Regions:
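Nudix hydrolase/Nudix homology domain
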Residues: 1-12, 77, 88, 122, ...
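Acidic, metal-coordinating catalytic segment for phosphate/diphosphate chemistry
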Residues: 18-55, 60
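Short loop segments at secondary-structure junctions
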Residues: 39, 60-63, 70, 133-138, ...
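A short coil-to-beta-strand element that immediately follows conserved catalytic motifs
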Residues: 107-115
């Protein structure tokens, strides 16, 4: 049996938070300078607001649908579940359906919320909804190189080997495996 440890924790809350305005804005994000004043110091944050994001993990006959996309920081192809920004006045599940169709040519339906989370709690706003379903049909003729159906076992192997690097995809696969 484990003994519960007593922690002497000091948590610093800022006395004042000042938003200094938008330092950058484009179609996909805005960056705001924020100054947090504590008792003995100040801390400057540059908070990037990407807006909310929706994703869908499709599992049909034990295989997961992954899109294949070039990613600059990898300078390579990344295997990812279909995901993207939620447009203004768009519901998260509708955004996930749209993104899946845009990225893979598959139309999915009967989505259920698997998990929602915030990937960063300090410098990035990007509330994320991950849905799951077993219902999808191909309605757009896409190049087969744009997507892949991969078994859950092989997805887990790809994560362990560093072949799947996208955090949203890793969270989605592990959540599907362990929470559902």
């Amino acid at each position: 049996m484990f003994k519960r440890q007593k922690y002497s924790e000091t948590i610093f809350f800022p006395k004042k938070i000042k938003q200094r305005g938008v330092v950058y804005r484009d179609k996909f994000k805005k960056i705001v300078k924020v100054i947090a004043e504590f008792d003995k110091f100040k801390k400057i944050f540059f908070v990037t607001d990407y807006g909310p994001k929706a994703a869908v993990i499709i599992n049909i006959n034990g295989k997961i649908l992954l899109s294949r996309q070039y990613r600059l920081l990898l300078n390579n192809i990344s295997y990812e579940i279909p995901a993207g920004s939620i447009n203004k006045n768009e519901k998260p599940n509708k955004a996930a359906i749209r993104e899946c169709l845009e990225e893979t040519g598959y139309f999915c339906k009967k989505l259920k919320l698997l998990i929602e989370y915030d990937p960063d709690l300090e410098c990035s706003k990007n509330h994320t909804y991950i849905f799951h379903t077993s219902y999808a049909s191909k309605i757009k003729n896409f190049n087969r190189d744009k997507y892949a159906w991969v078994t859950i076992k092989n997805c887990l192997k790809m994560i362990k080997e560093g072949k799947i690097k996208d955090s949203l995809t890793i969270i989605s696969i592990l959540s599907k495996k362990h929470l559902n």
